[in-house]
Amino acid sequence: MPKRTYAMRYVAGQPVEQIFPGSAKQLGQGLPPGAPLPTTEFLRVMVWNIFKQQRAQWLSVLKEFGRDAQLMLLQEAQTTPELVRFATSHYQAADQVPAFALPQHPSGVMTLAATHPVYCCPLREREPLLRLSKSALITVYPIHDGRLLMVVNIHAVNFSLGVDVYSKQLEPIGEQIAMHRGPVILAGDFNAWSRQRVNALQRFAQGLGLEEVEFSTDNRSRAFGKPLDFVFYRGLTLADASVLVTRASDHNPLLVEFQP
């Protein structure tokens, strides 16, 4: 029997909570009310494959480069005490999808948010060659103008022949984005290291009316000359986008600002 996919929610002063996928039907029928993401002038989103916090300085990058980010989308986030402490002291809620369990702390995508989500749907896809899982997380947050913002945090499968498994991981995400009426941010480590994968990803994004964030100084981490990390969006106005060059991970973090 396959393992059931779930997210772990970390909130300051509360026991860790296991969250099972919400019904996608809710997206078209109305979600429960919630407190909006606090925004002043901009909605700041940091996106980073944090390499299981294996290198020094990862915490200072989160604190400094990610300062004032209302949303933090991490991949390969390992729930060590240090990361959980940072998440719960700086954010209202942190939801992680354990892709696979390491000896002590599970690793997977983790979304840190300045308010609680009103919808949460964890997803996993197994790497066909390594038999390891990659995870994704769909969350929805109210924003100040009354709309609901869908946020998709993804770590795409890496080792596969062709793009069938790659596209299969995107399918359930696309179905939920298509059902959502409001603005969307889709971001993460897409492992788009081949022309086939880039084409599949661009077709996927265009089919959903998503625009790709472009970086004027593009220092994104690359494999075979192709960037691995992307941010796509709709229903928001892009204000700024930057990449920090750092040795704190094997990926450089992205910081994107939107005008909601």
UniProtKB/Swiss-Prot annotation:
Keywords: Cytoplasm
Compartments where located: Cytoplasm
Molecular function GO terms recorded: catalytic activity
GO CC annotations, alphabetized: cytoplasm
Main subcellular location: cytoplasm
Keyword Cytoplasm: yes
Entry superkingdom: Bacteria
Pfam families in alphabetical order: Exo_endo_phos
Record-stated family: Belongs to the UPF0294 family.
Name this polypeptide is given: UPF0294 protein YE0917
